[in-house]
Swiss-Prot record:
Main subcellular localisation: cytoplasm
Cellular component, GO annotation: cytosol
The entry's keywords: Cytoplasm, RNA-binding
Protein name in the entry: SsrA-binding protein
């Protein structure tokens, strides 16, 4: 029996297992998609513990499917005999039309698919993929300067409100 009326509030919450904050700094994210992950039991347990690293991960189409590569999901300690390989390729689940749309955009020069975060939505492991274009060193500096100026404006407004 669910605690809330209808049980929607508890199920609708997303529990973030890992986020790739560096990707938003290194790349311009132009579009995002949600995809399901095909995982083994020990991988799910390890994800729930937050034992995952997305820093070097990326996704790419192979044949008619999308795959997540270089995503390290650490071994689950209690899965002694039936553990998993931490760096194995993992299949992503999306609709055929979405996969075709993503494939068309990724095949353009300069674009890549980067996982932005892995989270649980209604008990299912999901990954948020971003269509990314690399930033140059100057672009990164511009982003830092823009962020700093926004902080300064927010601070000045906050000081003005306190008086």
């Amino acid at each position: 029996m669910k605690g809330k009326a209808g049980g929607k509030a508890a199920d609708a919450a997303e529990k973030v297992a890992a986020s790739n904050r560096r990707a938003r700094f290194d790349y311009d994210i132009e579009d995002t998609w949600e995809a399901g992950l095909v995982l083994t039991g020990s991988e799910v347990k390890s994800l729930r513990e937050g034992n995952v690293n997305l820093s070097d991960a990326y996704a790419m189409p192979r044949g008619e499917e999308l795959w997540l590569l270089n995503c390290r999901i650490g071994e689950y300690k209690q899965a002694a005999h039936f553990g998993h390989a931490p760096l194995r390729d993992r299949k992503l689940l999306m609709n055929r039309a979405e996969i075709d749309r993503v494939r068309g955009k990724v095949e353009q020069r300069g674009y890549t698919l980067v996982p932005l975060r892995i989270y649980f939505k209604q008990g299912w492991a999901k990954v948020e993929l971003g269509l990314a274009r690399g930033r140059s060193h100057e672009d990164r500096r511009g982003a830092i300067a823009e962020r700093e100026s926004k902080r300064e404006m927010d601070r000045a407004l906050a000081r003005g409100r306190r008086r």
